[in-house]
A protein has these predicted regions:
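Generic structural concept
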Residues: 37-40, 44, 64-71, 91-98, ...
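Positively charged n-region of N-terminal signal peptides that target proteins for export
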Residues: 1-4
Length: 139
């Protein structure tokens, strides 16, 4: 028994603090949350499907309004969950991207189809990255 304890002690001390930090992070990070994942999935799905509507200014404006609303909801939801700064930061990034698209439709009566598609692709990639981070949390 003493040999096992000594081996564990040496293994954790010889490999540096990295092991201790990984154990600490795994133990104290926020756990998987269905609501976080669902809201992120909504942003990703809507941004993917909304690309088809980029020719229609009215539909695109409504889509960006919806994306902005869901992103703000996600950001607010993640804000006070303990040990959850990564998800909150990713949600903040989604808010900024959706806000940029929303503001463009508010300011300009005609927004190019290219802008719409590129912005929705950015939102989709960002939501996918957030989904990977949120989905990989311990259960």
């Amino acid at each position: 028994m003493k040999k096992i304890l000594i081996a564990l002690f040496l293994a954790t001390n010889l490999s540096g603090c990295a092991v201790a930090y990984k154990v600490y992070d795994a133990f104290f990070m926020a756990h998987y949350d269905n609501i976080e994942y669902a809201l992120t999935n909504k942003v990703r799905t809507l941004s993917e499907l909304a690309i088809e509507d980029c020719k229609d200014q009215s539909k695109s404006k409504d889509n960006f309004e919806g994306l902005y609303f869901i992103s703000v909801e996600l950001k607010n939801f993640t804000q006070y969950i303990p040990d959850n700064p990564d998800a909150h930061k990713l949600a903040g990034n989604l808010v900024e991207l959706t806000k940029q698209g929303r503001e463009m439709y508010v300011k300009s009566p005609s927004v190019s189809e290219g802008f719409c598609k590129i912005k929705l692709q950015q939102i989709n990639r960002s939501a996918e990255m957030a989904q990977k981070v949120i989905g990989s949390k311990p259960r």
